[in-house]
């Protein structure tokens, strides 16, 4: 099988963006790069050979292209000599192909141009080099088209009628002279005939040759005829007299007649004799303004008339008509049949693509057959060429560019196939597969694969892949570098061989965010670079920022859809552009027996080294192999058994995956150990208290081990599932270049891209006896009846359950409770043996019935030990607007993972709880009730006592279940020794009939003075408010012998069936009483008491007056003494002193003025 590199055929522009990169076994630190003084297209194609790299550098501007040989011993490349070549190659290096079997190299220049009769022909020039590159062995120009100058005999038939003035006639002559001058160096022959009423030959073909093609001599003495315009007659005249051999006409020349006139024909007739003459008519002047007048010229023109009729409004425009006339003539040159293509191999561009396989060379020829394209099958000497194209050659295949890319598809059991791309076919592109012929046979088209997106350039790049390297190409990769979708530019379609046809199996894409990235502009099959014995593929995307290369690893049956590595151009060389425009990687260039990959860029070629791929074999072991239960379980005893933890040993060794590499390997391993890494809380801890431990160690192909230790927190709940120990590892990168590592040092490998995590579990020790098989025996019990459920907004229900295990340890014990939908789970708590034992419940939303719900509780998760008994309490809230029966029934069932079905008879229990509905009744006495009366001997003997009670029934959610209510009014019974008697009556609003009954008197009335003796029973009608009036008549029936106070009590209570209902706010809220205080006043005779008291008071007053007189109280002269002393006794101010008087002035007693003395007047 050959290996070819077909890079992008367009000169690509670069972008400067940023991209991420993945790292696998292609080292992004370039081993070497090559340069040459060959312009920016150096690197357009790259190809590895035995001792280096061949680089193609097509020319740009006035520069020629060339080939360069780059050796690893030097950074600069030398031109490849083209000894014996006498051609200048403008685009040499655009196409390179190599023969893997023979080592020969084919290089082509598809742009060998030359001029033929003022037309430019394009064909190819190919060189076949030996493996040593010492000059080309062979060279050839495949599909070279010799310049076959077309012979054309052209007659000017010009109008000389009287409608022309002299100036316009001269302009017609100048136009003919100009055409003759410009085509003088061609195979054209000219003749001229003037027509009016008659015809006149101005010069024949013979005259044209004799006069040395001089138009000034031939037309210098022509004079206008100035008569009618007999056009029919003139055309027949030319056929009969000018297109004749005796006039110099050539039998093998194309006959062209150019008619110039300024008016419509004056005569009639037919021109059938001119059917084999191409007729081009030019109408000039204002006579042909209307469309109808223009149509009069159509009869003289060839078909299609739109192409062969030209209307000019002035004669001055004749001088600009030559280009159009030349194009019309050139389109028919060399052929008289319009059903053939205009171009055959003149513009073939042969060599735009090439491939070699076992000495069999093919080159693409996109310009053949009017750009329909095809390819050329070359002999080994490059001298013979057989053109193969798409047949039949219809209009829809023109412009398809078949042969833009070619690729051999090798086969072991049959003749090989050749894939040829036509990226412009019907604007969507297609790829045709042909089967190579046997000796002397024909190529057969076997399959057509069409693109789907307009403008995607589907087939612009082809690559055949021998996946398992057995000589059979299993995959065909078709590039569409202009494909657009999902913000990605470019796509590669993978087709797999299925018997005789190829079917698409996958698509390869680049990174999003590069709509113009040209992913798939270069595709190449590498050797096995990752050591899995499958061919890998590299895809170039030269316009993703500075360019990028993707590596897709082979896998059984195809290619991995995701790249194992993306190498950015900026990552390799800052400032590089178009990185990935060409790629090749099949040989070792560094001497380490690992294939290196060569990547072309703008003006530079980069060599990327492969690194040896290894795997790391790891082993984990524990001591002890099981975790003792005493290390992790909760302990409530004073003495705890000593805990030692677990020892962990981790061993590593390198396992090479690239056996061709024979050097030394040394790797620096980074590892991370995790204990229960998948849990929120780890059950194992390293000495530093963390569940994670990291470190580095050096490893080699020899086994090396590390020792670790971990312990456990107290009270681990999950003692069933083993502890997961995970070891995650990677290789650390070292600084330096790949070449540094190859110079006498151990090679740093790369780790295989797989899951680099090893996990191992260490189980917990099981207490299951000698057979190591635990068999549990669970029992569930609950009180048959519990306290009632009182329905209210904040009501709750607590149910106690007892669970015991008389067998061995039970695993994952679960208690399932079925309860009515009127209840909602609130909480669960452990009562016995202690609250630290774990229990959790969850109300299930699925699996419940219409009437009941299910609660799932995990008890003592995960182990319920042998002989253990627990009591737990489950609490529920009630839901409003629920329907209830007389009893609530709860059914419980206990399960575990290791109980025999024959022991599950006692795993269920049920409890029944009575339901009480709320009654919200409030009673209170009214303010207008009688609270006090009194009796005197002289007062009335009879008084009325009135007690008024209000009964309010508050609405509730359970009014529909309201019980029968009865008001009980209690009134006292008179004592026999009391001086008063009383009678009672009860009335209600709304009015009902009340019945009275005597109550049994207690033995001791003194202790219960308000105990009723008579009770009235009044049925209550359900209303929001009810008034009950108790009226008593109290009569003084005996004489009041002494004053005393008595109490009369009436009471009210509301009764109902307490077995189904309860007072919402307690029974006291529906009870009330009124206490009446009765005073009995005994009146006595008090007149003599009053008289004696008055006399005693007067006597006492007289005695006091007499005593004061005897002591001289009324004869004292204290005032005079004070005035004589001028002071105040005891330092106190005089009584008449004004405290507000001005000092130094005498204060006068304004209430006791003395007479004015004479001495005071001065």
Curated annotation (Swiss-Prot):
Knockout consequences: Mice show decreased cellularity in thymus but not spleen, and impaired early T cell development. Obese mutant mice show decreased total number of T-cells, lower levels of neutrophil elastase and reduced cytotoxic T-cell proliferation in adipose tissue, as well as improved glucose tolerance and insulin resistance in comparison to obese wild type mice. Splenocytes from mutant mice do not respond to extracellular Isg15 as demonstrated by lack of Ifng secretion in contrast to wild-type cells which secrete Ifng in response to treatment with Isg15.
Disulphide linkage map: 70-77, 108-126, 147-199, 651-705, 768-774, 841-857, 994-1010, 1018-1049
Cross-referenced InterPro entries: FG-GAP, Int_alpha_beta-p, Integrin_alpha, Integrin_alpha_C_CS, Integrin_alpha_Ig-like_1, Integrin_alpha_Ig-like_2, Integrin_alpha_N, Integrin_dom_sf
Transmembrane segments: 1089-1109
UniProt FG-GAP repeat ranges: 28-79, 80-138, 336-387, 390-443, 444-504, 505-561, 565-625
Any one of the GO CC terms: integrin complex
Spans within the Extracellular topological domain: 24-1088
Region (Disordered): 1124-1162
Gene Ontology annotations of biological process type: activated T cell proliferation; calcium-mediated signaling; cell surface receptor signaling pathway; cell-cell adhesion; integrin-mediated signaling pathway; leukocyte cell-cell adhesion; phagocytosis; positive regulation of calcium-mediated signaling
Binding site for Ca(2+) 3: 588, 592, 596
Cited PANTHER family: INTEGRIN ALPHA, INTEGRIN ALPHA-L
Protein name: Integrin alpha-L
